[in-house]
Each structure stands twice: as C-alpha cells, then as structure tokens.
Amino acid sequence: MRQSGRKSNQLRPISLELSPLINAEGSCLIKIGNTHVMCSATCETTVPPFLRGQNQGWVTAEYGMLPGSTSQRIKREAAQGKQGGRTQEIQRLIGRNMRCVIDLKKLGERQIIIDCDVINADGGTRTAAITGSYVALHLAIRSLMKKRILKVNPLISQIAAVSCGIYKGEAILDLDYLEDSDAEVDSNFVFAGNGNLIEVQGTAEKEPFSEEQFIAMLKLAKGGAAELFKLQNQVLLGA
C-alpha cells in the first residue's frame, strides 16, 4: 500500500481551472494532488529568425518554480543571472511536445509562448505542466479563432503526460515527491489523444529495470493518460 493510500493505478485528485489569468489568450491552473502549476499561452506576431518569411508559426515554452513552491526556498534564477540545467531541460520538453500536436503552417507567422509556473511542487511538475499547457493552448487557439486572427484550427491532437515508477518493487502511477525521491525507477510518459506516444523518459535510480517492468509502467501510464484526456475534454466542452 502506498503511503497516500492510493492504489498502484490511481492518480492523485486533479482539477483544471480555466482562464485564471485575464490577460493571456489562454490559461489553466492545474492541480494534481499538492502539485499546482499555472500554465498560460500568449500569442505574439513575431517568430524566431530562422522562420521569418516562411509563413509558419512556432510554439515555445518557459518553465519556472516559485521560490516558495518547495519546502526550502528556491532562489530565483533571474536573480542569479542564468537558468539552471533542469529548467532548460523541462521547458524544451514542454515546447517540443506542444509542437507535436499543432500544425505550425496553419498557425501562420505567429509564435505562441507557453509559460509554466510551479506554485507548489509535490512531484510530477513537468507532466502536470504538459497536461495543463494543452488546456491553455486550446483556449488560446479558441480565442484567436473567435477574433478571426486564425481561420482554421491548427490543433492536431490532445496531449497529456503522467509519471510512473517502480517503488518498492511495484509499478505505480503518478508519483508524489516522497515516492519519487525513493523510487527504484522514475519515468515520464507523454501521449497524443489517440494513445500514441510522443515522448518517454525513464531512468533507473538504483538497478537496471526489466522489459516487463517497463511494459507495466507503460500500461499504467496509458490508463492514467486516458483519465487526463477525459478531464480535459470535460472542462473544455463546458467552457
């Protein structure tokens, strides 16, 4: 039994609050247990230099953790003058995954910037950021179409992400911080709406893990992603 009392295939309680930020084209506050991430999507009429004149858009992401989001205060990276390696890795992960589910040609010469700010961290911040960012992106596209800035919907698919791990010899879904810090294996799965994989990250923390253990984690992750897709659809249809 997990310390939280959850079953091995059980997600933490999840909520998606739509449009908490009034100035962004789209925003979502995602809460997965005690992990809370504010996700927003903002449109700019500029693109990176390598895309100028190609009538093609771009989606990029920025990620950060508020100083009080963990048990010990995190120093602001802006105050230190540079981003840490973890921050760069996660925001690149979010950006490239978001680009997989949008037709950049249909976006035109525009850039959508996804901002993910971790308010409270209790494991799974990057997967929560991806799941919440899709909702923010969807709302931003809806806003741009309503304003007739976009004539066609460039979104190709839903996207959601979830963590899995091997904890005390058992495959479990959606690790919290205590589980993550003591897991034998830590992995993240990113899925498209049709169930196909977009990205997989997996690391053995103590000993190599078997193919059977990987398949067990994959099955749990796929089931968890299906629940996340259902919740995304429910809140977006009701908006």
Swiss-Prot record:
Keyword Ribonucleoprotein part of the UniProt annotation: no
Enzyme class: transferase
Keyword tRNA processing listed: yes
Catalytic activity: tRNA(n+1) + phosphate = tRNA(n) + a ribonucleoside 5'-diphosphate
InterPro entries the UniProt entry points to: ExoRNase_PH_dom1 (IPR001247), ExoRNase_PH_dom2 (IPR015847), ExoRNase_PH_dom2_sf (IPR036345), PNPase/RNase_PH_dom_sf (IPR027408), Ribosomal_Su5_D2-typ_SF (IPR020568), RNase_PH (IPR050080), RNase_PH_bac-type (IPR002381), RNase_PH_CS (IPR018336)
Segments crossing the lipid bilayer: none
Ligand binding (phosphate): 86, 124-126
Signal peptide region: none
Keywords: Nucleotidyltransferase, RNA-binding, rRNA processing, Transferase, tRNA processing, tRNA-binding
Assembly and oligomerization: Homohexameric ring arranged as a trimer of dimers.
Function: Phosphorolytic 3'-5' exoribonuclease that plays an important role in tRNA 3'-end maturation. Removes nucleotide residues following the 3'-CCA terminus of tRNAs; can also add nucleotides to the ends of RNA molecules by using nucleoside diphosphates as substrates, but this may not be physiologically important. Probably plays a role in initiation of 16S rRNA degradation (leading to ribosome degradation) during starvation.
Name the UniProt record assigns to this protein: Ribonuclease PH
Upper classification of the organism: Bacteria, Pseudomonadati, Pseudomonadota, Alphaproteobacteria, Rickettsiales
